[in-house]
Regions:
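Ribosome-associated RNA-binding proteins
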Residues: 1-125
Length: 125
């Protein structure tokens, strides 16, 4: 589960390396976010190629959670878990900032209507 002040890895080519969760969107009592939720983040570290970076340090963006360490039970009885908590950055309109997502993403994003993120990802689990 992702909550406020959690450090997350960025899995797209927007130029950011790590982000910190500021707010979990989705209601005033919602304290934790899971796979497929949207959160508000601030950029903590950038990748080494700063000239190509589409984002700046300490700026605020929205992000979609694409991988979590918490396991996810599928309908066929299998459990799926990832090794890291990862997000993909998006702009105010909800479109991805990067043009590629590195690593696999979960198929549950397909049910939550994030087709643009699925189309730029490398694989589904």
């Amino acid at each position: 589960m992702i909550q406020q002040q959690t450090i997350l890895k960025v899995s797209d080519n927007s130029g950011a390396k790590t982000v910190r969760c500021i707010k979990v969107l989705g209601g005033f009592k919602k304290k934790q976010a899971s796979l497929g939720d949207i959160i508000v983040v601030s950029i903590q570290k950038l990748r080494k190629l700063k000239k190509i970076s589409k984002v700046k340090k300490k700026e605020i963006y929205k992000a979609l959670i694409i991988r979590t360490k918490i396991y996810l039970k599928k309908k066929n009885g299998f459990y799926v878990e990832f090794q890291e908590n990862a997000v993909a950055l998006m702009n105010k309109q909800g479109t991805p900032i990067g043009t590629r997502i590195i690593g696999p993403i979960s198929k549950t994003l397909k049910k939550k209507k994030f087709q643009k993120f699925i189309s730029i990802s490398s694989g589904l689990v």
